[in-house]
Curated annotation (Swiss-Prot):
GO MF term list: large ribosomal subunit rRNA binding; structural constituent of ribosome
Protein name per Swiss-Prot or TrEMBL: Large ribosomal subunit protein uL11
PANTHER family linked: 60S RIBOSOMAL PROTEIN L12 (PTHR11661), LARGE RIBOSOMAL SUBUNIT PROTEIN UL11M (PTHR11661:SF1)
CDD domains linked to this entry: Ribosomal_L11
Length: 140
């Protein structure tokens, strides 16, 4: 018989840098999870993505055991990395902060494809282009 999921905790944590301090500690402590066990496992699984923020979905079971799924980094994080900027524009329609190429957008779309609600690569690219526009990043 399958274990019953008691709680699902969603967090965004920098890759390889999970520690018991907030926000990880309080969120998992309330669910009764072994915080250090999660931190060690998460850091081991995400060490090659250092510097990126990784969304994680932690399923906590009745017996206080847990499993977690790491997702792809958020599109804005990948776009900022590709464009080489710290943050998006405060006024995206007036002030453009950077430019990315169609090839960079295609690469990001392919990386995010499993998490996007898109039927094909073109639809995924349009989603990423829309995110870029809302950040003040021009797509060429």
């Amino acid at each position: 018989m399958a274990k019953k999921v008691e709680k699902v905790v969603k967090l965004q944590i920098p890759a390889g840098k999970a520690n018991p301090a907030p926000p990880v500690g309080p969120a998992l402590g309330q669910a009764g999870v072994n915080i250090m066990g999660f931190c060690k496992e998460f850091n081991a699984r995400t060490q090659e993505d250092a510097g990126l923020i990784i969304p994680v979905e932690i399923s906590v079971y009745e017996d206080r055991s847990f499993t977690f799924i790491t997702k792809t980094p958020p599109a804005p994080v990948l776009l900022k990395k590709a464009a080489g900027v710290e943050k998006g524009s405060g006024e995206p329609n007036k002030t453009k902060v950077a430019t990315v190429t169609k090839d960079q957008v295609r690469e990001i779309a392919n990386q995010k494809m499993q998490d996007l609600n898109a039927a094909d690569e073109e639809a995924a690219m349009r989603i990423i282009e829309g995110t870029a526009r809302s950040m003040g990043i021009t797509v060429q």
